[in-house]
């Protein structure tokens, strides 16, 4: 397969952030071929101030044991305190004894490997379309022309809604054929488990913020979420590129399961720290939408993924999102005469469209979106 390279004019590279533009001649991301070259294409090389630091210190994140948690008042109080401290500082914590079977997690990783092992032509049958958040993406080569991530992804929607009870299974069968029903069955079950887990976590977040225990659980009960399979191939020049660039998740809550390979890094106190893979734990982090719901009390923290020259890395990311027409506004308990509103009301559909059509997610996405909402017409 031939590899075509993108050339961008200085004018195109200087385009403002809120105009992503369309790339006419996208680069084909084929890592096995790119790794045969002496260097990686310029589109994958990040600026010096954003290049990765591979050997970084480990981040101390609290480990929350969910076993019998919500039925034990003392344990619940301790957990909510630890979560509050972490979410005010960097927004990351781990959960164990979460009730998700090891077999299901293993199957989800296995089918991730099977999908990304398929020929490119097969994966492109579900190619992500411009302006959409679902489908297969090959390093976002058709969306951006610079600072490309060294990864492939497959994203699909999960609707925790009785009227669309098999949305994931239907996606795989409709998009790829009935031969992919086993894929759909595994990821349908996995997403249902993630949705259930996220609602438990929402109870703890509510308690930690001093609002009614069921407030956030009820807010997200009929969620319209996103599941993403991430594949980071080995790279001959891992010191020049990133698997995922620095960003804050625009969604509400991310539940991540890593394989055994290091790669996740979080920016805390002006330095990058790593979160070591733990096969028995899920990494949980606050996203921009929940930061708005908490009226800025909890932080959506900058994070990224690095790659290496020896091992491929895979991860499973479930992004909890509210129903698309649900108005995101803080509960009254988080507002008073002293604490003013930090962000205007919005719906998830508005924010999602902003990130897909107008803005490349980074550490300022929520503020840029707020400015965009309130700018004079």
Swiss-Prot record:
Assigned keywords, A-Z: Iron, Metal-binding, Oxidoreductase
Family per similarity comment: Belongs to the iron/ascorbate-dependent oxidoreductase family. GA20OX subfamily.
Name assigned to this protein: Gibberellin 20 oxidase 1
Expression sites (tissue/organ): Highly expressed in stems and inflorescence tissues. Detected in seeds, roots, leaves and siliques.
GO term, biological process aspect, one: response to gibberellin
PROSITE patterns registered for this protein in UniProt: FE2OG_OXY
Protein's job: GA53 is less effectively oxidized than GA12 and is only oxidized one step to GA44. Involved in the promotion of the floral transition, fertility and silique elongation, but plays only a minor role in elongation of seedling organs. Acts redundantly with GA20OX2.
Pfam families membership: 2OG-FeII_Oxy, DIOX_N
Catalytic activity: gibberellin A12 + 2 2-oxoglutarate + 3 O2 + H(+) = gibberellin A9 + 2 succinate + 3 CO2 + 2 H2O; gibberellin A12 + 2-oxoglutarate + O2 = gibberellin A15 + succinate + CO2; gibberellin A15 + 2-oxoglutarate + O2 = gibberellin A24 + succinate + CO2 + H2O; gibberellin A53 + 2-oxoglutarate + O2 = gibberellin A44 + succinate + CO2
Annotated EC: 1.14.11.-
Gene name as annotated: GA20OX1
